[in-house]
Amino acid sequence: MAIERTLSIIKPDAVAKNVIGKIVSRFEAAGLKIVAAKLVHLSRNEAEQFYSVHKERPFFKDLVDFMISGPVFVQVLEGENAIAKNRDLMGATDPKKAAPGTIRADFADSIDANAVHGSDAPETAANEVAFFFAGLNVYAR
């Protein structure tokens, strides 16, 4: 089993519902450690850069508008198979299809306002962590 790092974003809808702590406690209960974290309000430019992979997709503008609608809680999670573990905890992108007990089933309202983002592969995790955190701002625990 490999120790990995992955990026997790608690999106504006979940921040507004004041469930940051409830979501973070699920990561910790699953054995993931938070090795970096911050609350930020993304600018349009930052959101467009972060989601540039979706630039040509029809939902891009709505995604960016949503991600700048309020603060987000950005964190780096570390642990064995952190990427897959985080994705399992999040549940399906559409909360209506998410398994009961997953973060999205419990806290998300729609496929757009779906509470959390998580890296989908080691390469994207490395890029996403670097986007938000310089190396000196991530701490082994």
UniProtKB/Swiss-Prot annotation:
GO molecular function terms listed in the Swiss-Prot or TrEMBL record: ATP binding; metal ion binding; nucleoside diphosphate kinase activity
EC number: 2.7.4.6
Keywords on record: ATP-binding, Cytoplasm, Kinase, Magnesium, Metal-binding, Nucleotide metabolism, Nucleotide-binding, Phosphoprotein, Transferase
SMART domains tied to this protein: NDK
One of the protein's GO biological processes: GTP biosynthetic process
A Pfam family per the record: NDK
Subcellular location: Cytoplasm
Cofactor(s) named in the record: Mg(2+)
InterPro entries named in the record: NDK-like_dom, NDK-like_dom_sf, Nucleoside_diP_kinase, Nucleoside_diP_kinase_AS
One Gene Ontology cellular component: cytoplasm
Binding site for ATP: K11, F59, R87, T93, R104, N114
HAMAP family to which the protein is assigned, alphabetical: NDP_kinase (MF_00451)
Protein's job: Major role in the synthesis of nucleoside triphosphates other than ATP. The ATP gamma phosphate is transferred to the NDP beta phosphate via a ping-pong mechanism, using a phosphorylated active-site intermediate.
Protein name: Nucleoside diphosphate kinase
Species whose genome carries this gene: Variovorax paradoxus (strain S110)
Species lineage: Bacteria, Pseudomonadati, Pseudomonadota, Betaproteobacteria, Burkholderiales
